[in-house]
């Protein structure tokens, strides 16, 4: 960094708010980045020659004067001055702030500067917004510099490296240390660094609760890697409600407290939509407090949904832990019809694989020669619904489609962190499935399961009360196609039958594109209400709820009981099928209408949307320039340059006396690790989902575990609460207990009611991880004899020390994972964090036998540079 100084001079009489703003920016530069800008008089400046910022009132300037007369000029000249003294990182941050000032609000900007001659027209409130952004982005430089720096990946595979799947390579690249220098095997524990944390306004409440409940305040490891979106319940129609105001206030408080760079507030985007379109990158590890976090697999991020406490700990530390999971491979071949998009394809996969079977607790890796025909929008829908398959997540192997999509982003900061891995040809998969895309047709998943899939032609003329096009699953290309279907129907004079119709795009940028294309008008003419961007009917807990007994056709991702509203019935399909069915309010084959749409027109509209994503702010304001923008030569897709993960390995470090207190000092679980739990059984069946355990309608009004428990299984098992209170404190369930959403409120509700243990044939991945995270004992037993004996009301004895469960005179062994045991001994992750601080994952991993601490921070870190090694001193990863 070169040495230098910057001087500031005020000329004439500027408004006080402008002077205060400029001086505030000067203080921010000094306080955050140590850059001193000295305020001098004109006479003093004549004696020296540093880079100078001369601010003047508009009426005090002469033609050709170098004085700065506008916000645009101030930020531009400040960047020039900083560039002169070698502060390139700060220049990049301020240029980004300037760009946000010029960008319209429906594109995520402030819309303060329309052109270079705007002057100091911004009022105090707008200038405060700019000041906050400058502070946030400069603070982000500090956060990035102090955060863990991942070793650079290798340009080629080295000898003696085990073959790995795509997910394994991403985890290995992010691991602090591996159990073996050759790589990782299924089931091995890793402490890993995360790239992004994402949350909704609703899950943020649970995240904060996990900290506040133990007397700690939430914190972030990087203020530029926390994506918080208001989408689940907030809506302009409910902004006046006290609980909604609390949620909005919670987001605003987080933005201010953490100096967040990536908080767009309420109803700008559904959590996943713009995050995947504009933030997630290939090779990243993303953690989110929402089960559809897996959507980012569309751009080859390993994106995994977890519970609120888990995600809060990752947000505070920049770390988390995983056991290396199995993967299954879905190999695409063939080419789909032009109108077959991602929703039809994932429904076809659900039809073939079924829920919670082959994909359960595994990662689904998508690839094959047919993948090149799938856009990133199609991949979004496919990955989004991998959670409905029961998978941990889904991820596409990055290819030319991925590379072009990421390269088309306008901001380099959101495409410069991409790392392109591909699975090894000899990688091991639990199963491989072939999907011929040419066989995919329009499907519908009938209530109440996403895998109850049949061709649309088998359900023709089913009467409907409502048609919904929306939710994150419904991408931009789906909305465009649905509008074209409606347009054809309107042109043919199709009448609109009585019924409810609603369309909710996934983000304001998509709304803006549809508006300029004239497609919002088409939806309006076809009778579709257009409320604000939100999850809407897909969640059924905000302003939009389906009525009791109503039969809906929806393009959302879930059709569980009570999902769209208490007592409602939902079937899911593509947006095109919903659009075709909305005229008669009966399920309709969309092909007659689709056949009237020129595929070339559809592609032209998608190309325009692509161009607007990468357009400069000025071009976005003038739809007339779109035709010019669209004349750009579309670059030919190119394959990315693939790399190999760096393998960090350090031999296990023996515990020393000055290391954090061992878990061995905490030998008792919340249920009594050395004691025996004696209770009675309450038996449930297979596939008990989190919507059933704690219905969404009760989450907002139940801030404590006890209040959540008062509504546990209220809709499906009204006697459950009284039975648990009467002493039936052990839940015995079947397959995939806790499937559905990531809501941590489900195990919290059980624990708050008084449930001591849940035993099941299997747990859904997120729910199964949430149990020990909140300190609730969970046991997997697959022996059918146990379930024959464990009926409601039967006495049961659980001996954690002996790892046995006894019922009806028979004893059944069980295995408890070491990490789960470590968490339960601490009564959950939040309590462990309170005791161990930001070293919580290092300490927890250190207590898992034979894991070597999942990566100690002592000794030396080996950083890969090209093909050579250089040794640098270790830095703290806390």
Curated annotation (Swiss-Prot):
Signal peptide interval: none
PROSITE patterns membership: ACONITASE_2
InterPro entries the UniProt entry points to: Acnase/IPM_dHydase_lsu_aba_1/3, Acoase/IPM_deHydtase_lsu_aba, Aconitase/3IPM_dehydase_swvl, Aconitase_4Fe-4S_BS, Aconitase_4Fe-4S_dom, AconitaseA/IPMdHydase_ssu_swvl, IPM_dehydratase_rel_enz, IPMI_Swivel
PANTHER family referenced in this protein's UniProt entry, alphabetically: HOMOACONITASE, MITOCHONDRIAL (PTHR43822:SF2), HOMOACONITASE, MITOCHONDRIAL-RELATED (PTHR43822)
Lineage: Eukaryota, Fungi, Dikarya, Ascomycota, Pezizomycotina
Protein name: Aconitase htyD
Residues bound to [4Fe-4S] cluster: 472, 535, 538
Protein's pathway: Antifungal biosynthesis
Family annotation (CDD domains): IPMI_Swivel (cd01577)
Function recorded in the entry: Aconitase; part of the gene cluster that mediates the de novo generation of L-homotyrosine from acetyl-CoA and 4-hydroxyphenyl-pyruvate. L-homotyrosine is a building block of echinocandin B, a fungal lipidated cyclic hexapeptide that acts as an antifungal agent. This is followed by isomerization of 2-(4-hydroxy-benzyl)-malate to 3-(4-hydroxybenzyl)-malate by htyD.
Disulfides per UniProt: none
BP GO annotations: L-amino acid biosynthetic process; proteinogenic amino acid biosynthetic process
Gene: htyD
